[in-house]
């Protein structure tokens, strides 16, 4: 009987302990297991950067020894009579190698020494040194669930306040997936991300990341961490004398990539190169990154994970060095940012063409709320942004290594980035011909294999969700070639092709610009042969559209752009229908072995185009958005429009109708308006085509020719709607940045809007805004409204309509911390030009109610009412009968706001030029002129389905078969190119792919069932042996055995 009890006890222990057996390995340092509520943490990552006073990065045209660099700088500064300068020593592993930059400290006020340095023939550029701050804070995903465990209770503090400033991965994860209903499901089932993406299939084939060098740029790693067996090198690039990770973020990232136990990474046998680039106080410098990047090139790193980023895509030393890294065959993977769900919030370097930018999803395949959205804003105002992120993967509730062992779960795109980096490392180890692996070929494989998520547009998901096995199939038979991203243009496909699909095109409209990225897997450099060719399909009315091209003269590194402008021909002005055609481009790259005959590799790519054309809408329904006069960070300090939002000090989202004014655009489209974007001066549009010019949050100055033309346009029937923002020089001085460490001031270049410039534009109609700054809630026409840091109307014609409200004086609050209420603040004015056929003008003092960035209450209804007024001359009854109508202010006795003395707007303005004294306008630039491509018509039928799952041209998936291996997992069947399977269905299941959770659950249930059956068998036998013998027929004993084993035939 004792033996039976021991057996039962062992079974119970076995059954209860099996689940946690793996999790206990390597946890001897901890006495207590983590409590359940500690298993999922939200990681708040916030960045800020400042310019270090008197310190500059001197970039050279090549790599030189320290002695040569010193000689160049000394000779350059001799003639400038600057004596107070020195080269700042950099003690790190790259000090013994030649470098392409130097950090100097030069104290001068006139900048003569800097100008002299830039004139030296061996010096490429001189830029300020930047100090980067990162703040990490780990918080519970669900604050309702208590946690008594002390292991993860530490709150990480930065040397600076927790806020997002100039360089940022986001505003933190206050809006992370922990607030989603689906997020709570993840608590019960901790996910192993590597197995979820089926990395174990490749492991069992013998691929584990061996012989692949992967670099982790983060907070370091402890020397004897139990999760890692192949840490090749740890280097420190900070001013602290330690290589260990004092925070845990670097350990987590490394674990997702290469942990070998517990929370397994993707490539446990990869060579880990740990670059410690952040101190325990989360401080770093641009020069630390540059030195570390140079060392990564020297070490021939294959894959580099960079879970940092920020909006400053004009930080030239950093951007240039990233280009150099990828040109040296380093595959860089970077987080796209944590500023979602707002659009136009992509972070650098993930927004670069040569970098794999990664967004985040949860385990239910929903786009994570925190994941930043496209488009890129580099190209504004004259162009249009590119598609980013490239792909998305799991970034919510991902498990990774703890700082001393064990596992924890974190969320963020800084978590999704190492998921892709680990997957790429594993993929690279599967490629037999390593010479075919480069940043372009890997990116081509990832985006061509990605599984598209249903109901999500391309600026949220890029090309779709990472599919590891499909990417393996593509890479295993890859041949060097060029490809396009996106691979087709279908302006009728919603929602994936939003915003293009949201509005048809028509004759007379601004050309629709599609920015396509060219990926060149044939070589680091390339070119487009001849010119792209436009081939319209005549049966599909392709001759009703015309296209123009702008493209990179050189494709470097590994990539370039192809901007396509699409317009409607005059003959289709009254036509409605679908038009199709395609573009052919040929890309050439030099052969790897340069032959005397100059042989090149070439690849020809076809880009299908499909558009919907409608008759030109009436003038009253056409709204023109002024993009040309919107400025943003980078490069200048343009402050936020709502001064209450102290954690977001910069206006950096592009102020475009497809970024932070997306909701307003969607509303206007739903109301039947057609919105076009003007990326050129006012002299470059035909005002007779449009009913209303919409100017919102304008920071730019105006050319004199623009002012004169706009006056003529309004007199001839164009209407003008202006949404302004605050402008007060005293407040601007108050909101400037001061960094205690660097003693550096950041002074705003303008206010929320450039009110002095707007007043010059409006002065011809006796209108203008004041420098008052007001805030408050109010009701207008039975609508609740909020005035967020707006200005008031200072002057308005007497025969106009003016609406007033009672507000708090926010300017007084900011300057003196005093509270005052001001009555009859004029905020809205409506005016009809008295001349026959004249237009109408509307002024409103606040744009925050239209802006998605920090909008509290929208005013879309008001915009509707104002457009009804400007388009049809109908004054809304809700405004004409308002009890808040007052006599228009005359502006008597009020001095108009003046530009702040000493501002640097001319540095970033397209209108002003640098000049001593008052700034002067530049010469008026010529209007953009498009050269339409000569069509080469095709008398053939266009393909019916432009998007099949993206295929690289040289790959025949019929021949791609996963090798056999011993496994209970079903064989993954390759999909043939012509097969109509789930690959062509958004959100479909892979052919031959089974449900991962079910696959992992079946062996557990089988084991439990076997144990229960065994226990039952032992108990029954024990009872039978210990029971007193009774007289009964021997024939019944087999029946007892049959009851115990109904599936067996008992033996007598």
Swiss-Prot record:
EC number(s) given by UniProt: 3.4.21.112
Residue list for modification Phosphoserine: 168
Ranges of residues in domain Peptidase S8: 190-472
GO biological process: cholesterol metabolic process; lipid metabolic process; lysosome organization; membrane protein intracellular domain proteolysis; mitotic G2 DNA damage checkpoint signaling; protein maturation; protein processing; proteolysis
Protein's membrane topology: Single-pass type I membrane protein
InterPro entries in the record: MBTP1_N (IPR055143), MBTPS1_3rd (IPR057060), MBTPS1_4th (IPR057032), Peptidase_S8/S53_dom (IPR000209), Peptidase_S8/S53_dom_sf (IPR036852), Peptidase_S8_His-AS (IPR022398), Peptidase_S8_Ser-AS (IPR023828), Peptidase_S8_subtilisin-like (IPR050131)
Leader peptide range in chain numbering: 1-17
Site residues by UniProt (Cleavage): 186-187
Reported cofactor(s): Ca(2+)
Positions annotated with a glycan in the UniProt record: 148, 236, 305, 515, 728, 939
Database matches in CDD domains: Peptidases_S8_SKI-1_like
Protein name (Swiss-Prot/TrEMBL): Membrane-bound transcription factor site-1 protease
Organism the protein comes from: Rattus norvegicus
Keywords: Autocatalytic cleavage, Calcium, Cholesterol metabolism, Endoplasmic reticulum, Glycoprotein, Golgi apparatus, Hydrolase, Lipid metabolism, Membrane, Phosphoprotein, Protease, Serine protease, Signal, Steroid metabolism, Sterol metabolism, Transmembrane, Transmembrane helix, Zymogen
Tissues of expression: Widely expressed. In adult rat, highly expressed in anterior pituitary, thyroid and adrenal glands and in liver. In 2-day old rat, detected in developing skin, striated muscles, cardiac muscles, bones, teeth and internal organs. Highly expressed in retina, cerebellum, pituitary, submaxillary, thyroid and adrenal glands, molars, thymus, kidney and intestine.
PTM statement from Swiss-Prot or TrEMBL: The 148 kDa zymogen is processed progressively into two membrane-bound 120 and 106 kDa forms in the endoplasmic reticulum, and late into a secreted 98 kDa form. The propeptide is autocatalytically removed through an intramolecular cleavage after Leu-186. Further cleavage generates 14, 10, and 8 kDa intermediates.
Function statement: Serine protease that cleaves after hydrophobic or small residues, provided that Arg or Lys is in position P4: known substrates include SREBF1/SREBP1, SREBF2/SREBP2, BDNF, GNPTAB, ATF6, ATF6B and FAM20C. Cleaves substrates after Arg-Ser-Val-Leu (SREBP2), Arg-His-Leu-Leu (ATF6), Arg-Gly-Leu-Thr (BDNF) and its own propeptide after Arg-Arg-Leu-Leu. Catalyzes the first step in the proteolytic activation of the sterol regulatory element-binding proteins (SREBPs) SREBF1/SREBP1 and SREBF2/SREBP2.
Propeptide, residue positions: 18-186
Cytoplasmic side: 1023-1052
Lineage top rank: taxon: Eukaryota
Oligomer status and interactors: Interacts with LYSET; this interaction bridges GNPTAB to MBTPS1.
Region called Disordered, residue ranges: 877-900, 1026-1052
Biased composition (Basic residues): 1026-1037
Main localization, broad class: endoplasmic reticulum
MF term (GO), any: serine-type endopeptidase activity
